[in-house]
């Protein structure tokens, strides 16, 4: 039976930062499309962007945790 690969957290901070940037870009694109959307679609976009903002906050907290773990050698 093959052994599982060890947990490689060495690039987690960078991956999370990319995810934050992509999410910010998605928010901006969604806001641009709102001018062409119906009132119902605008409300759905607003709700989705609120969830995206919450996700960004969680990812930023995870970035801090991962950066601290990196400094302490992932103990």
Curated annotation (Swiss-Prot):
GO biological process: asexual sporulation; sporulation resulting in formation of a cellular spore
Taxonomic superkingdom: Bacteria
Family annotation (InterPro entries): SASP_thioredoxin-like
Keywords, in A-Z order: Sporulation
Location in or out of the cell: Spore core
Upregulating conditions: Expressed only in the forespore compartment of sporulating cells.
Chief location category: other
Family the entry assigns: Belongs to the Tlp family.
Full protein name: Small, acid-soluble spore protein Tlp
């Amino acid at each position: 039976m093959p052994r599982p690969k060890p947990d490689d957290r060495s690039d987690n901070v960078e991956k999370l930062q990319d995810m934050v940037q992509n999410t910010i870009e998605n928010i901006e694109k969604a806001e641009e499309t709102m001018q062409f959307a119906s009132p119902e679609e605008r409300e759905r976009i607003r709700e989705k962007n609120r969830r995206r903002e919450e996700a960004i906050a969680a990812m930023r907290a995870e970035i801090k945790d991962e950066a601290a773990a990196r400094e302490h050698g992932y103990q």
